[in-house]
Each structure stands twice: as C-alpha cells, then as structure tokens.
Amino acid sequence: MTELAQKLPADVDARRQHAVELRRWLHRHPELSFNEAETAARVVAELERLGIPCSYPGPGGGVIGRLETDPAMPTIALRAELDALPGADLTDPGYRSIYADRMHACGHDAHMTMVLGAAALLAEKPPDGNVVFIFQPAEERGGGSRVMIDAGALEGVRAIFAGHVTQEWPTGKIMIRKGGMTAQSDRFCITVKGKGGHGARPHEAIDAVVIAALLITTLQTLVSRQTNPVHPSVITVGRIVAGTAANIIAESAELEGSIRTTIPETRDHIHKGIRRMTEAMGELHDAEIHLELSEGYPPVINTPEEVGLVRTCVRELFGPDALTTAPHASMGSEDFSYYLQHVPGAFFRFGARRPEWEPMPLHSPRFDIDEAVLAIGAEFFDALARRALHHYASATP
C-alpha cells in the first residue's frame, strides 16, 4: 500500500474491496462509444443502491445522478466516462476483458469507480450543497459530453471537476496545471486521385502512392519549419490506404491523420498550410487531391479559481508532496473541454503506477492501474466536492 493510501481514513478500507470488485467488473465488461448500455445499467444500480436519484435515457445517452440537499445552495458536478476502446486486452488475466476486441485501455473503469466511491461518501454524509454525478457516453470517439450538456446535466451547476488516471506519475501524485491541460485535436482525410497503370510503364501513369508519400513528408515541415516551436503542435498521418497489387501503379490513395495544437493561431496556420500543400501537390503532379478537415475536441483550459480549489484540497488531504504539475499541456485531447465552454472547472490527473512498473501509455493493450488509486480518487472527489461547495457558498453574497 502506498504512503498516500495509508493516510486515508480507516472507514475507506471497508469500501476498498467493493471498489476493486466494481472496477474489475467494469474492466471485464467494456463497451464502445454510444453502446454502453450494460455499463450504464451497472452505474444506475450503484447509484440506486446509494439512494441517489438518477436518470438514463438508454443507449446513446449517459447517466445523471443528483444528490440534492438544498436547492438554494451551490451545485457542483463530478464527471466520469462510460466507454472503452477497440482492441485486445493484455492486462491481468484475473480481470481481463471478456471480449477479444475491446478493453478499458484509458482508465474509464477507474474513473467510474472513483466517482461512485465519492457518491457513496457524499450520500452517507450529505454536503452543504448539491452534487451532480455525470457518467457520459463516448468520450473516446463521439464527444459524448455534448450529449450530456444537451440533456441538461449542467443546469444550475456552478463548476465541474474530472480526473484521469495515468502511469506518467506514481500512485499518490495528483497533477494539475493552470490554463491549458490538453491540446486542440482535429482530423483530416486526404484523397489522392492519379492515374493507374502498369508497374513497368510509370510514364503512362500518375502514381498516387508517390504523391501520398511526398505529402506525408511535406506535411511534417509545417511543424518543423513553419510553426513557432514555443507553441507545441503535432501532425500525425495514422492511416494509409492505397494499391491493389505489387505490379500495379495505384490510381488512388487515402491518408487519414490528426492535428494537435495548443493555441488558435497555430491551429489556423496549420490548417491553411495543409490546404496550400495539398493544392500545390495536385498541381505539381497533375493529380486530383481532395482534403477534408474535421474539427475535433477543443483544448481543456482549466479556470484559475477551480485550479486553486484542487491544489488546496490535495495539500490538505494528502500533504504538499502529493501535488505535482507539468511544464506544458498534454498533446492529447479530452471532450471535458465542452463542459468548460459552459461552466468553470478543472481537469487533473491521478498517478496510478506501482513503484516496480515501467510507465505504460494510455490506449496500450497493457495499460492497467494500481488499484490503490481507487480509494485515493474516491476520497479526493468527496473532499473536493465539499471544499468547492463551501467555497462557493461563502462567496455568495
């Protein structure tokens, strides 16, 4: 057990086993974005067991639980995600996914367990205020936070908080930073239309594969040579589809990728650059090139007041050594950003790595957590909710 876990009150020990069992059940039963019916049913059952009224509209929606003590008092929200990811699960066989093609590779099973653990503590000793528990669908692939916003999850909410497990830090550390926590994420699809031909007669064809390869390398110069390096940005081509046989010059090729930026000016610059380069490449090689740019999640920008609440709560609950920060925003993306377009809030990270583990990245088929973090997260969300509600009530004239 970590030093931080040992600092938790004794009554948390009685909940720890239930938390581990719940998290392992969720881990064994992963469901993909907008198809989380079984997961949602388990969350509803847990909330009902605690006597917390909740609603769930069915597949495609999320679960909203409301612990209301006084309508005149402030309301805050705690958020977790229901969905998992496609891919094989190579974690502990004792709780490995029962499905061959999907797993909780991003820790959403842990997030649900933490927020439900906090719900149990808050229900047992109601706070001076109201708490909304948001269990959203489709964080990974569909911007499910917007579904929850449309469903009224933020009505009357003063601020919202969410955490995310990571092996970047050891268990016992909680990381938060002012301002940007994550990057803006956009996607692109480039279709190259050339002219097919025989591999022996390239002069009679327009090789879509060669043009695609040139595009891949040229696009990287947008970051390395045309963007201010003090503002991080990443262009990734993650998928290429082209060709039918080794001796046939491909008539078409398709590239799909992502763009990650940290400020709007860099984003606009890269979007314009991709348009310019695709148009020029088509003209240069006498090919038709079609570009489709799709807007992704905005950056998560933590608000100063809520960052202060998180930092104070970490220090008071676990001591100053538990608090850490990061020198720059993560280049990952998070649809928690949509909530922050409506209300203030803060997004932070829970270290979840055992001392003997080598860090494993999120979305890896081997990503797992030190289950000691479950009690830490539940206790922290409980304390944060109480501190935030007290703070907002005190600030109300």
Located regions from the model:
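Electropositive phosphate-/nucleotide-binding environments in soluble metabolic enzymes
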Residues: 2, 6-9, 13-20, 33, ...
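Acidic/His- and Gly-rich active-site-bordering loop/insert found
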Residues: 2-104, 109, 113-128
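Metal-dependent amide/peptide-bond hydrolase catalytic core
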Residues: 3, 213-397
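Active-site beta-loop-alpha junctions enriched in small/polar residues
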Residues: 31, 81-83, 138, 166, ...
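A structural signal for isolated positions on well-ordered beta-strands in alpha/beta enzyme cores
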Residues: 55, 132-134, 290
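Histidine/acidic-residue-rich, glycine-tolerant segments that coordinate divalent metal ions
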Residues: 63-64, 84-103, 109-110, 121-250, ...
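Residue-level recognition of well-ordered beta-strand positions that form the cores
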Residues: 66, 189-193, 258-260, 292
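Non-cysteine beta-strand/loop elements that form the S-adenosyl-L-methionine
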Residues: 77-79, 188, 347-353
